[in-house]
Amino acid sequence: MKQSNVKRGYQKEYKVAKIYQKWGFMVEKVKRTRFNFRDFFNKFDGMALKDRTLIFYQVKSNVIDKEVLDEIFQFPLPKSVYKVIWVWRPRKKKAIWERISIIQDSVFRDYVSQEGEIIKEEVKGGDKK
């Protein structure tokens, strides 16, 4: 039996939460019911907190729309709060996560294994545009 998109989404969100917990963060995910889908600020699936670092994150499967990226980039949060988008990238040999971090007005991109190890860092400083 084929899994629903919602169930697959929950599984991906759970995996990201586990990675943050492995890195020492406390994680709070959105509480959802069958008929009520609410994200933090209608944009983020969860938040992670460690020391003085607060991260709001969004989890996507395979593709991220430019509109979603722009919305999250432009969403006003204090400069000390990070906005991170996790994109599941299925591969033939081994699936990985692409992590897009928006810190103040800069965008950073890296790749993380399913186990939470950073595989490759690609830093793109400066404005997203």
Sequence positions of predicted segments:
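Domain-level recognition of nuclease-like catalytic cores that cleave nucleotide substrates
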Residues: 7, 68-69, 77-129
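Active-site metal-binding core of divalent-cation-utilizing nuclease and nuclease-like domains
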Residues: 26-51
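Surface-exposed substrate-engagement region within the catalytic domains
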Residues: 28, 74-77
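Acidic-basic catalytic patches of nuclease active cores, encompassing PD-(D/E)XK
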Residues: 1-34
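Hydrophobic/aromatic beta-strand patches that form the interior of the parallel beta-sheet core
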Residues: 28, 57, 84-86
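Active-site-adjacent loop/helix micro-motif of nuclease/hydrolase catalytic cores
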Residues: 38, 55-74
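Conserved catalytic cores of phosphodiester-cleaving nucleases, focusing on short active-site segments
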Residues: 20, 46-63
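A generic structural signal for well-ordered alpha-helical segments
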Residues: 20-21, 76-78
